[in-house]
C-alpha cells in the first residue's frame, strides 16, 4: 500500500477503527508485560486494584467535558471508554503505550501492567454474570479487514483478557461494513444505540467495538399517577416544564457539607445503585471539583435513611462525544498522530487512531428503565420531612455494587435537551 495512504481507528460507544499512517518508527521493544491469570485472590478480586483508577479517570473525563460546555447535558460510560482504550493499548508500544495507560490514570510504578489487564478481565467477567433482576452486559468486537494479518499475541490477548469476538469484514464495501458494525452494537444494546457509525473511512482496516448495556428497575419505584409537570430551572433566566416524579418515603439521602449538596442513593433491583448530587445555588462547579473515588466509596458504605419528599425529573438524554479532543486534554495524543506506534496490532502497515467517538443513552422513569409490578409499604416518621427537588442542574453516577465501578456518569442541565 502506498505510504501516502493513511489508515486509522474509530471508537464509537467504544468503537475503534484502525487505519494506516504515512510514517512509522522502528518498534522500541514490547511494552506489554506478560499477563498471568492463573490464579485470583478471591478475597481481593483483581478488579479492586483498578476500580479507583477507573473512578479517577471518570471524574477527569467528566471535568473536561464540563469545561467544554456548562450549558449541555453530559452522559458517558467510563467503563466502556476505558475498556476500549486499555484493550487497544495491548497493541501499542513506546510513548503511544505509556500515554494511553497514564491517561486512564494507571501509574505503572504503582501497579504492574499485567494487573491492569487482569483487572479488566475480572471486571468484565463480573459485570457479565447473569442477574435475574438486572440486565447488564458488555461486549467487545474486533472487525478485521479480509486482507489484514494481526499479530497473533494481540489477537490472543484481546480474546483472552477482554472476551472479544472477532469478525472478518470487507472495509472496501463501506456500506456493508457499517451495517455489520452497527448491527452488532444495536443487537448488543437491545436497540438503544442505532446507526452508531455514520461514516467509515474506505482505508479502515480494523475496527474495535466496545458496548455496555444496562437495564434496571428501581428497588422502590415511583407511582406513575404521582408524576406531575413542574418547573426545572436551567439557569437564572431559563425555566422549562418537565414531568417530575414524586414520592414521599424513606430514602438514603443526606446533606453533605463538604460538597454543598444533597446526596441521594437509589438502588436498582440487583447490584446497581444510582447516586444523585443536587448542589446548592452557585455550587455546581465546587461539587464537580470535589468528587473523588474515596467520597463515592464512603457514600456507598454508609446508610443514611430518612424520610423525604422527593421530586426527580423523568428524562431521556443522549451523550455523543469526539474523544480525540477531550482525551488529548488528558495526555492521550500520540495514538492519534502519524507518530503512533501500533506495531503490536499488525506489522503489515503503520496505524493510527483516526477518530474516537463515544455514544451513550439514558432513560430515567418511574419504574427505572422498564415496567415493574412491585408494591411495598413503609412507615414514615411523624416529623415534617424535607422536600428535596431536583429542579435545577444536578450530577449523577450509576455504580455496579460488586465492583464499585462507575458504569455511567452524567449531568442534567436541561431535561428537555435530547
From Swiss-Prot:
SUPFAM superfamilies: Serpins. Residues 1-24 form the signal peptide. Residues 373-392 are annotated as: RCL. Pfam families: Serpin. GO terms for biological process: acute-phase response. The reactive center loop (RCL) extends out from the body of the protein and directs binding to the target protease. The protease cleaves the serpin at the reactive site within the RCL, establishing a covalent linkage between the carboxyl group of the serpin reactive site and the serine hydroxyl of the protease. The resulting inactive serpin-protease complex is highly stable. Inhibitor of serine proteases. Its primary target is elastase, but it also has a moderate affinity for plasmin and thrombin. Inhibits trypsin, chymotrypsin and plasminogen activator. This is Alpha-1-antitrypsin.
Amino acid at each position: 500500500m502506498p505510504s501516502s495512504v493513511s489508515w486509522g481507528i474509530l471508537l464509537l460507544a467504544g468503537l475503534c477503527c484502525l487505519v494506516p499512517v504515512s510514517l512509522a518508527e522502528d518498534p522500541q521493544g514490547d511494552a506489554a508485560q506478560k499477563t498471568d491469570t492463573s490464579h485470583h485472590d478471591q478475597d481481593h478480586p483483581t478488579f479492586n486494584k483498578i476500580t479507583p483508577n477507573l473512578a479517577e479517570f471518570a471524574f477527569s473525563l467528566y471535568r473536561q467535558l464540563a469545561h467544554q460546555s456548562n450549558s449541555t447535558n453530559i452522559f458517558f460510560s467510563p467503563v466502556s471508554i476505558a475498556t476500549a482504550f486499555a484493550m487497544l493499548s495491548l497493541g501499542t508500544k513506546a510513548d503511544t503505550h505509556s500515554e494511553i495507560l497514564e491517561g486512564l490514570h494507571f501509574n505503572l510504578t504503582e501497579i504492574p501492567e499485567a494487573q491492569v489487564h487482569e483487572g479488566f478481565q475480572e471486571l468484565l467477567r463480573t459485570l457479565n454474570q447473569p442477574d435475574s433482576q438486572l440486565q447488564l452486559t458488555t461486549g467487545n468486537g474486533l472487525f478485521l479487514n479480509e486482507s489484514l494479518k494481526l499479530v497473533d499475541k494481540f489477537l490472543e490477548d484481546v480474546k483472552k483478557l477482554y472476551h472479544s469476538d472477532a469478525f472478518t469484514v470487507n472495509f472496501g464495501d463501506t456500506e456493508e461494513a457499517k451495517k455489520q458494525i452497527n448491527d452488532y452494537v444495536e443487537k448488543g444494546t437491545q436497540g438503544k444505540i442505532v446507526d452508531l457509525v455514520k461514516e467509515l473511512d474506505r482505508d479502515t482496516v480494523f475496527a474495535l467495538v466496545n458496548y455496555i448495556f444496562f437495564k434496571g428497575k428501581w428497588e422502590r419505584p415511583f407511582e406513575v399517577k404521582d408524576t406531575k409537570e413542574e418547573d426545572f430551572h436551567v439557569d437564572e433566566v431559563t425555566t422549562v416544564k418537565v414531568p417530575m416524579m414524586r414520592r414521599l418515603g424513606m430514602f438514603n439521602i443526606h446533606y453533605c457539607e463538604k460538597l454543598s449538596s444533597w446526596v441521594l442513593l437509589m438502588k436498582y433491583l440487583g447490584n446497581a445503585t444510582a447516586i444523585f448530587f443536587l448542589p446548592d445555588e452557585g455550587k455546581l462547579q465546587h461539587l464537580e471539583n470535589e468528587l473523588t473515588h474515596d467520597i463515592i466509596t464512603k457514600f456507598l458504605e454508609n446508610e443514611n435513611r430518612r424520610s423525604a419528599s422527593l421530586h426527580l425529573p423523568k428524562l431521556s438524554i443522549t451523550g455523543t462525544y469526539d474523544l480525540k479532543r477531550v482525551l488529548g486534554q488528558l495526555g492521550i495524543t500520540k495514538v492519534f498522530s502519524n507518530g503512533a506506534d501500533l506495531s503490536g496490532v499488525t506489522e503489515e502497515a503503520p496505524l493510527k487512531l483516526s477518530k474516537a467517538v463515544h455514544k451513550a443513552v439514558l432513560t430515567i422513569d418511574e419504574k427505572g428503565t422498564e415496567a415493574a409490578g412491585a408494591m411495598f409499604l413503609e412507615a414514615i416518621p411523624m416529623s415534617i420531612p424535607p422536600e428535596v427537588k431536583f429542579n435545577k442542574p444536578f450530577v449523577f453516577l450509576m455504580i455496579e455494587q460488586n465492583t464499585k465501578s462507575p458504569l455511567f456518569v452524567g449531568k442534567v442541565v436541561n431535561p428537555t435537551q435530547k
